[in-house]
Amino acid sequence: MGKASHSSTAQDAVALFDSLRSAYSATPTTLKIIDLYIGFAVSTALIQVVYMAIVGSFPFNSFLSGVLSCIGTAVLAVCLRIQVNKENKEFKDLAPERAFADFVLCNLVLHMVIMNFLG
């Protein structure tokens, strides 16, 4: 009984990943690029946290600035992805150029705050 349950669970997991892969293959290239950017920003934040755990956090302002910059940029990129997605009905009247301009402006404000926090 346990082995049959395990194999059906494994088959369900494989079916789930196959369906996710096929659904994601239909995603437009622009959204995939934004997804890569989000993944890069989050992985950079994780690398900084691991580095801080191993080496230490002597200039704590620098550590906080780096992590908050990465996470803030990732959050802004998620907002950009939501606004640019054609299937999202909430932002159908918003031009992609306007969404990108908002993203750039918010990133400038975020990084000015981060630079101010550094001192």
UniProtKB/Swiss-Prot annotation:
Topological domain spans for side Cytoplasmic: 1-35, 81-98
Pathway entry: Protein modification; protein glycosylation
Swiss-Prot/TrEMBL GO biological process terms: protein N-linked glycosylation
Sorted UniProt keywords: Apoptosis, Endoplasmic reticulum, Membrane, Transmembrane, Transmembrane helix
Regions crossing the membrane: 36-56, 60-80, 99-119
Residue intervals annotated with topology Lumenal: 57-59
Cellular localisation: Endoplasmic reticulum membrane
A cellular component term, taken from the record's GO annotations: oligosaccharyltransferase complex
InterPro entries: DAD/Ost2 (IPR003038)
Membrane topology (UniProt): Multi-pass membrane protein
Subcellular location, principal: endoplasmic reticulum
Its job: Subunit of the oligosaccharyl transferase (OST) complex that catalyzes the initial transfer of a defined glycan (Glc(3)Man(9)GlcNAc(2) in eukaryotes) from the lipid carrier dolichol-pyrophosphate to an asparagine residue within an Asn-X-Ser/Thr consensus motif in nascent polypeptide chains, the first step in protein N-glycosylation. N-glycosylation occurs cotranslationally and the complex associates with the Sec61 complex at the channel-forming translocon complex that mediates protein translocation across the endoplasmic reticulum (ER). All subunits are required for a maximal enzyme activity.
Self-association state and partner proteins as the record states: Component of the oligosaccharyltransferase (OST) complex.
Family: Belongs to the DAD/OST2 family.
Protein name (database record): Dolichyl-diphosphooligosaccharide--protein glycosyltransferase subunit DAD1
